[in-house]
């Protein structure tokens, strides 16, 4: 990622979270990774005083407490948060999850790959996209 801002990973599965962290290291992404296990915890981080806003949010959908769709509704309704790009990274095969995610203006919807090499390629494409994308100043 071009920015030095953190990446926020919202993922309840510790194995999947470690896989994302490992993939980011393997492709030499140096942004700090902030990991939260559900939407409520992620909102606490985003609203916390002194916490850097992330350059991107990697979001799972199937989580306890506040799931990914509920989290998206809250983030996209908040003027201070709605411009943060969100990429859904999920094992969900539900068509409605994809429809609802894009209705809430996600930047992308990526399936979690079972094969590690394919997963790293997915993370690499996310990184490349956000490295090449030009955001407005101050974003």
PLM region spans:
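Conserved acidic segment of CheY-like receiver
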Residues: 5-25, 57
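Conserved active-site segment of CheY-like receiver
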Residues: 11-12, 88-93, 113
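Alpha4 helix (beta4-alpha4-beta5 surface) of REC/receiver domains from two-component response regulators
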Residues: 22, 70, 93-110, 114, ...
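Short amphipathic alpha-helix used as the core "switch/output" element in two-component signaling
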Residues: 25-26, 44, 69-82
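Helix N-cap/capping motif at the beta->alpha junctions
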Residues: 35-48, 68
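Active-site beta3 strand of CheY-like receiver
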Residues: 51-58
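Active-site residues of response regulator receiver
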Residues: 59-60, 90
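Receiver (REC) domain active-site loop signature in two-component systems and cognate sites
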Residues: 63-66
């Amino acid at each position: 990622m071009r920015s030095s801002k953190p990446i926020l990973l919202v993922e309840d599965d510790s194995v999947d979270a470690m896989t994302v962290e490992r993939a980011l290291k393997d492709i030499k992404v140096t942004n700090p990774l902030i990991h939260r296990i559900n939407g409520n915890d992620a909102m606490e981080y985003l609203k916390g005083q002194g916490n850097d806003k992330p350059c991107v949010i990697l979001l799972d959908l199937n989580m306890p407490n506040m799931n990914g769709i509920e989290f998206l509704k809250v983030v996209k309704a908040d003027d201070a948060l709605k411009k943060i790009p969100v990429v859904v990274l999920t094992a969900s095969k539900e068509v409605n999850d994809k429809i609802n995610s894009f209705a809430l203006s996600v930047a992308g919807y990526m399936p979690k790959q079972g094969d590690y090499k394919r997963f790293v390629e997915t993370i690499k494409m996310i990184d490349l996209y956000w490295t090449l994308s030009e955001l407005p100043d101050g974003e």
